[in-house]
């Protein structure tokens, strides 16, 4: 089951107005809590109900694409390609422990979308642990500041969905 706040907020999220306002949707919680599923389902509804252009991408894949573009001196061009999407879902931002170059392109991407286009992000790390992502305290604070400025923040503090399913399977 979804945490109470996530259930309560769902109707207002599904109306899509947060995308019109270039707001972000940030989900936090331990692995297996349903964050990715929640964001993917919202993204699917944004496509079906509102005809928004939505991209779902893992943090690792996003960073790799940005790095390749930077090395080819085409980072600006790659960032403009992402502008075609009304909202981009970035999955598992905390899993990738970034090098300085990776951190820089990820920060550039986040800063580029700030107040212009929406992001939906899942993370296993709370903000106090984001120094593991960005390494530099100032960059960490700047990234968090931009993301939370216009955001809906949801904590998935429920039991593990995978654990619940495993327990049900054992009982059969």
Role assignments for model-derived ranges:
Residues 1-14:
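N-terminal pre-Walker A segment at the start of P-loop NTPase domains
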Residues 17, 45-48, 78-82:
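Short, conserved, surface-exposed binding loops centered on an aromatic residue
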Residues 34-35:
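Conserved glycine(s) of the Walker
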């Amino acid at each position: 089951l979804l945490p109470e706040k996530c259930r309560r907020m769902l109707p207002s999220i599904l109306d899509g107005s947060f995308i019109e306002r270039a707001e972000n949707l940030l989900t936090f919680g331990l692995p297996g809590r349903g964050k990715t599923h929640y964001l993917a389902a919202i993204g699917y509804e944004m496509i079906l109900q509102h005809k928004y252009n939505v991209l779902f991408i893992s943090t690792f894949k996003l960073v790799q694409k940005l790095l390749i573009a930077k090395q080819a001196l085409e980072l600006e061009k790659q960032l403009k390609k992402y502008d075609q999407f009304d909202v981009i879902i970035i999955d598992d931002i905390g899993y990738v422990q970034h090098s300085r170059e990776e951190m820089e392109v990820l920060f550039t991407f986040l800063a580029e979308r700030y107040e212009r286009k929406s992001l939906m992000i899942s993370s296993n790390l709370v903000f106090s642990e984001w120094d593991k992502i960005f390494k530099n305290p100032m960059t960490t604070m700047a990234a968090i500041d931009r993301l939370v400025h216009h955001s809906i923040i949801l904590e998935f503090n429920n039991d593990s969905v995978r654990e619940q399913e495993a327990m049900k399977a054992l009982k059969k």
